[in-house]
Amino acid sequence: MITVLSGGTGTPKLLRGLHALVPDEEITVVVNTAEDLWISGNHLSPDVDTVIYLYAGLLNTDTWWGIRGDTFLTHEALVPLSANEFIAIGDQDRAVHIARGEMLRNGSTLTEATRHLCRSFGVKARVLPMSDAPVGTMVATENGLIHFQEYWIRHHGQVPITSVVRQPERFEASQAVLEALMECDAVIVGPSNPVTSIGPILECIWVPDLLREKPVIAVSPFIGDAPISGPAAALMKASGVEPSSLGTFGLYRDFVDIFVQDIRDPVAVPGAVRCDTLMKDQEKSTALAAEVLSLMKSLA
């Protein structure tokens, strides 16, 4: 059994490769939920949904979010009616948010709601939100704290930020996540944003302790000297971390056994394994996944 720590953009590309090589039933994906929020009355869990849609064969892999071929009629109708509708949510995607919101309002945990959605979509991989507690990533601007989604989507990451804040400061991993980490044979830390995607998972109580007991392979999100997607560099700077593979390794060094960085990366991480981590298509995703699995066998 393999457990993968994932955000919503970089790591799903690696999951695409693992999907081609490993039976879905042997994969557990622990997913960041610190970017979740309620919007237009419904519960958005973007990283969880990306992983569900990937394994369901529905993901829009042009954008790496949402459902392929979705329409946006409800969003277009809501925009003039709601100041809060700042994210373009597809109609089928919104149906998932509505269903999840209803389950949460009726007393289900996020883990239970996610399990129900996976069953509904026929997903065989085990997809686990990192925590059942509400967690939010906020960024500090000159006008105060704003949610990460507002910073990245509404303001396109163009607002100067001074720090990254998690609310609340302490939160627990779900029992299902703790069990998955205890029972798995190895852990892959995917190439997602180390501050806003992987960071919240690592901040869950007990998670770092469990990782130290397992073989762990981490893949840097940096291609060359820049992250392939998202605002990782700006967020790492605001967190006081060097925006590079070396800075990423520094966040993981306490538990990682093998660190993988891109062949084009000019910043050398001592002891790192060099691979082509630019997963621009299925073939590239599968090739990197095969490399990671081979490295995993070397740790057995």
Swiss-Prot record:
Keyword set includes DNA-binding: no
Pfam families: CofD
Enzymatic reactions: (2S)-lactyl-2-diphospho-5'-guanosine + 7,8-didemethyl-8-hydroxy-5-deazariboflavin = oxidized coenzyme F420-0 + GMP + H(+)
Gene Ontology biological process terms from the UniProt entry: F420-0 metabolic process
Positions annotated to bind 7,8-didemethyl-8-hydroxy-5-deazariboflavin: 49
Enzyme class name: transferase
Molecular-function annotations in GO: LPPG:FO 2-phospho-L-lactate transferase activity; magnesium ion binding
Pathway named in the protein's UniProt entry: Cofactor biosynthesis; coenzyme F420 biosynthesis
UniProt keyword terms in alphabetical order: Magnesium, Transferase
Cofactor: Mg(2+)
Listed EC numbers: 2.7.8.28
SUPFAM superfamilies: CofD-like
Domain of life from the UniProt record: Archaea
HAMAP family named among the record's database cross-references: CofD
Function: Catalyzes the transfer of the 2-phospholactate moiety from (2S)-lactyl-2-diphospho-5'-guanosine to 7,8-didemethyl-8-hydroxy-5-deazariboflavin (FO) with the formation of oxidized coenzyme F420-0 and GMP.
UniProt record similarity statement: Belongs to the CofD family.
Complexes and interactors: Homodimer.
Protein name: 2-phospho-L-lactate transferase
Organism: Methanosphaerula palustris (strain ATCC BAA-1556 / DSM 19958 / E1-9c)
Lineage: Archaea, Methanobacteriati, Methanobacteriota, Stenosarchaea group, Methanomicrobia
